[in-house]
Amino acid sequence: EYILTVAKSGMTEQQLKAKLESKLLELGAEGTSFSTIVASGHRGALPHGVASDKIIEQGDMITLDFGAYYQGYASDITRTFAIGEPNPKLKEIYNIVLAANQKAIEAAKAGISSKALDAVARDYITKQGYGEAFGHSLGHGIGLDVHEGPVLAKNTDSALQVNNCVTIEP
C-alpha cells in the first residue's frame, strides 16, 4: 500500500526503487533478497528488468519484483499496478495473468506435480492467446534462500509436499 502513495508520474524507476528499498529497511528488513526490479511502461513485460532511468508516465503499468531478508528468511513479491488509467489492452492482459495466478494458487496442493501446476497457469494464458509471452517458469520454493526447491516449471516432475513454501509468478 505504501508504494501506491509514493509512485508518481515524472519520477524514474530508480527513484521508485530507492523509496521501496528504504521502506523495507525502515520496517526491519535485513537487506534485499535479490536485486529489486522496477519496470514501467514498455519495460514492464521484461521478466528481469532492472530499474532504469526511464521516467514513469501517466498510464504506465509498473511491475515491481522485490524481496527482503527478515529474521533469516527470504521473501519474493511481485506486484503490478498502473499510474492513472492504463491502456485497455494492458488491463485485459493484466486480468488474464491475474486469473492464471489465482488458478495456479487454487491448484497448489500437496501431491500435484510441478509440471501439472505450471500447466494450470500456462494453459489458461495460452487459451487466452498469449502463450508465446509466457517465457518464464511458474515459480519456485522460497525459505532461507530466495530460490529453493521445488522448481515449478513445465519440465519438472517433482511434486509439491506438505509445508512447501512456493512462489506462483505468472
Per-range role (PLM):
Residues 1-170:
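Active-site neighborhoods and metal-handling regions in enzymes and metal-associated proteins
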